[in-house]
């Protein structure tokens, strides 16, 4: 007999402890992605597959290249007419230098957080994003123990290479194994669902839960200037280094105009309403007015600020091989981020900023994506959060960076950033992303398990 009622709280408590154990073991399996194809997710993938196998599932471990492993499994639902839901997360992590950490980054130790005093799991990947992989696995293991099933099919995809190009992970799966995602219309992954503490205009505490509903596109650019090579004592008029330096300086100084997408406008409205910030028709009339409005959102301003305009950040320079030799070519790398609908404006602006002496081209490009915030999926996310935090204010968000949602969106899947995690006040959770002493509160994992259980069976 399949029971579809809410599982006993005692069972979910055990699932929360299971998530903590699974997360510790995943952290202990070093899956550092060094970039450029240098990574090894195999041990983490095998452990995740073993955990899912213990729930009666038959996961596939798929290698796109030696040791670049991905795990995919379908969890059958009770309603074959319902579209499937994709739940994606990545197994790779960024590098960590143990000398900089208070506790070893791959030991999976539990210790109190020095900021909040609450017990936390420390280690690389506890925030990004082995925590979510562990929570999802714990939920389906809980279902197996209690005879529970979701209403719709779930496709779980724990992938490689998100921290670099996705070439060995989501991108490879979407190209070579698209059939595994058949029937998926909605997906959830990283990029939202964590508590953001703020204060209303009257001083009352407000708990916001931003949910990713859009992502700026990635536009990694190579700028190239060419000139006459020669001796440093006889400088040419067309010095490539000087031309490139001028262009890079213009790019770095440029004040990009505001470009408010529907998701960002919805986010501003939702945050302002939650905080009691009054709005007026002129709030978005000019760039200055937009910036002033965002500033009035106080602690919530960082949720909105990166999503109101395009950006282009110079990050790399390369020229020459010897100080007394004028190089014939100089290059720069620029990290561009482009809002939905602002691609043409971005390109024309880069043309103007680089000028006639410097060419630019895309080194890597992934378009911006967005998903509906007025449909059943976003409503179900909000309902699940409010079921376990009645005072939750769920707000849409446009992510400043990017996730594997960009890849899975190509398959026609509406993707949301939803990795639920309660956070104590005073902890800057987002600052721990890729940071030293990355850690997640144990109660945050327990909360996430409860919310995911509700959402994934809704």
Task: Go through each PLM region and give its residues.
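N-terminal helical capping/dimerization or prosegment-like subdomains
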Residues: 2-98, 329, 333, 343-347
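Metal-dependent amide/peptide-bond hydrolase catalytic core
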Residues: 2-6, 193-214, 218-447, 453, ...
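Active-site metal-coordination/substrate-binding segment of hydrolases
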Residues: 82-155
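Acidic, glycine-rich active-site loops and adjacent beta-strand->loop/helix elements
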Residues: 91-93, 157-166, 190-195, 229, ...
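Short, conserved micro-motifs enriched in small and acidic residues
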Residues: 119-134, 163, 238, 439-446
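Active-site-proximal alpha-helical scaffold in enzymes
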Residues: 130-148, 164-175, 240-246, 250
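Beta-strand segments within the central parallel beta-sheet cores of soluble alpha/beta enzyme folds
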Residues: 151-159, 185-188, 263-265
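A glycine-rich helix N-cap at a beta->alpha junction
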Residues: 175-193
